[in-house]
């Protein structure tokens, strides 16, 4: 390890740490850059109450790093991608999960119609249940708009609308799927603009953010992963998951596990 012992000052002063301060009062309430002896800024700033890390030249994926004695990363701040990763798995610290699903759903409106899946924790009372509704269409993708008043059961919107309060990024969506007959089940995740001013509850500007398709059967439970079309979804959007029995009206069950992080 380098030593100052028996060395001339001009051979080691660049290795001495100092704060960016013209006076000689030392560390105080003002946060100042930590510098080398020749006045070059480091990424660290100090005061008597604060420690700040800010890149001096370039953002990097390891601007701040805490690791174990053995070198395993425990906490890492990535200023290139605006991420904080934690734990041995180095998972984004703002990672969350959202579950959606349908159980033994009967597509009584006919084959090939898109049906929204339940997104929120709601309880059904009496004979009420989530029923089919052909309003979402039977095209390749679900409808991009919704007139709430045209729904068979508009109250279902409370169960199927996932309203975002923050900007999010989708990381991965996995599914489980089963059908009473051998059928192709198509699945989508859409985001819409929500009307909160005039036609309250109506949706517009629908965009597909993820999709999947699986050959489901009655004797198997298929697991798979969605293809992400567009990962970022902005705050105040309504997110809806859909399932579609492509060629049959047999009952089916699906489960979506949505891994995402807040931006």
Short names for language-model regions:
Residues 1, 39, 89-263:
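Polar, enzyme-active/binding microenvironments
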Residues 1-119, 183:
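Intrinsic low-complexity, repeat-rich intrinsically disordered segments enriched
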